[in-house]
Amino acid sequence: MYRELTRRGLIRDTDLIETVFTVGESEYQRLKSITGGDWEAVLTTAGSALTERDAQRIAGFGRILADFLISPLDVPDEARETVLELGAMMNLWVATFDRLLDAGTNPDDIHSSYGVRAAFMRNSAVDRAYERLVPPARRAIYRLLSAHAHAIDDLPHTDARRHIRQDIDDCFSEMHQKGRELWYKPWSAEADKITSINAIAILGLPGWLATPNYGQSRYQDHIDWMEGVGWLFGLIDDTADLSEDATTESNNAVQTQLATNSDRVVIERIADKTERLFTELTEMTTHTDCELRPEDVFSGTINSWLTPDMA
């Protein structure tokens, strides 16, 4: 896979990982402060599945990926900063949920569907009541989601575009529900795909509450592209995990494709998808106020999975 993507000019040498850790350190400290001192309970529960260095990298990637995903949008500086902070927050939330599942924690002991509904009420009294009912690790995770929901409401165009706020809530709820299904039920390719797609789309959707320029067709085109990126990143992640997943007998979407197709067919299929999304990115992106070149983030993120020593 790496050789084919390199041959097509889709893998580039960048110093993305260095930047990820630089921005991730400050984002991680900010997010820890939101949890009110309960974050240590999360790390204790996760054990080796989530270290502080992991969390810094995850927060940094969340910020950088949000910047990449909203690159086609014209977002003023102050609102852009909020969207990037939301990206760091949500990426850490999603990864923490996944890592705690990997550590053997029941999903409802991490964050229940009731907790999702409580956070989305965006009511400080509800927040305080819920936080009194749960142990420290769950309280920390709840506070991150509640802070995300409140910050979404503070974006400049939320009141005028309530349907987009609802799309964000629905995107998260579906991702959370499918994540629970993957724990409680036999592995489902559909549920696996939805969690991959939504984990990326939810980083970029807030940009549409921050940009003054909105059009329904552009909005849908952007969603379609983000969903494509989410599914591609899921496939690249599974490509990197092929050997480990085979050893542990874990489910893997790429291995599922390899069961009925040759290596060459699967590689070319994924490479074609990568090339198409890269082309669509260059066609959509007209703004130059990103912290990093969007093309470098796209390529560097893929590279970070396929050459894990970078991380």
Question: Predicted segment positions?
Answer:
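Generic, well-ordered alpha-helical scaffold segments in large soluble proteins
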Residues: 68, 99, 103, 238, ...
